[in-house]
Design a protein with these regions (language model features):
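Interface/linker segment at the passenger-translocator junction
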Residues: 1-226
Length: 226
């Protein structure tokens, strides 16, 4: 027999979800979302999903080998399906506020002795399973360094070199400092893996798990996306 199930699902925006990523380190993401989806599946028909799921907000604390804890804030974003569930497209932003960062490696001038906060902005795009991750640095609105030409120029220069940007992001996450051109704490491969996979894999994994839980609840476990 050929059985086909066609469902229209409205995800409840008031639903709050906790996703345990690692029981040993205590990595948990808390999030909220909503959306309207059409899901079709049959005994002779592959799973098809169409529609958009919106992430309204979320929180995540990244534990690096249980020694470092770094709080991330998930901004609003979307996951869009046009049929094949594995080809979902994401568009999402996250940020991490690094506090009291040593700025000495950014400038040889008066800013050498300054410490200040800096925001790491991360944008995720492309495939849900393998997102593209780009970074950007932003100084808080009240930061005195916003008027420092050398510091702002250095931060802007990082944008033009993906490897350098990833290296600086990794250094901020682990050591709360920028590193100079002469320092080489990370190999290129490890740096890219730490900076992009830390955020990209975690967030894409969370998005997948979050949606899958909503889907299983809506269909009483009949349909899941894995």
């Amino acid at each position: 027999a050929n059985i086909t199930v066609n469902m229209n699902i409205v995800a409840n925006p008031s639903c709050k979800i906790d996703v345990i990523l690692d029981e040993e380190t205590g990595d948990v993401i808390k999030g909220e979302g909503n959306g309207r989806l059409n899901i079709r599946v049959g005994t002779r028909e592959a799973l098809s999903i169409r529609g958009q799921y919106e992430i309204s907000k979320g929180e995540y604390t990244f534990n690096f080998q249980t020694f470092f804890k770094r709080p991330f804030t998930l901004k609003s974003g979307t996951i869009t399906w046009n049929g094949d569930p594995y080809l979902a497209i994401i568009d999402m932003d996250a940020e991490y506020l690094a506090k009291n960062v040593d700025m000495s490696n950014l400038s040889s001038g008066s800013s050498l002795r300054l410490k200040d906060d800096i925001i790491i902005l991360s944008h995720l795009s492309g495939s849900l399973k393998k997102p593209l991750v780009t970074f950007e640095f932003e100084l808080p609105e009240r930061s005195p360094l916003r008027k420092d030409y050398i510091v702002t120029k250095r931060l802007a220069d990082f944008q033009n070199d993906e490897n350098t940007m990833n290296k600086q992001v990794a250094s901020l996450l682990l050591f709360n400092t920028f590193i100079s051109d002469e320092q080489n704490f990370f190999s290129q491969q490890n740096t890219i893996g730490l900076a992009t996979n830390t955020i990209g894999s975690i967030l894409s994994g969370w998005l997948t798990n979050t949606f899958n839980r909503e889907l299983e609840k809506a269909t009483n476990g009949v349909v899941s996306f894995k």
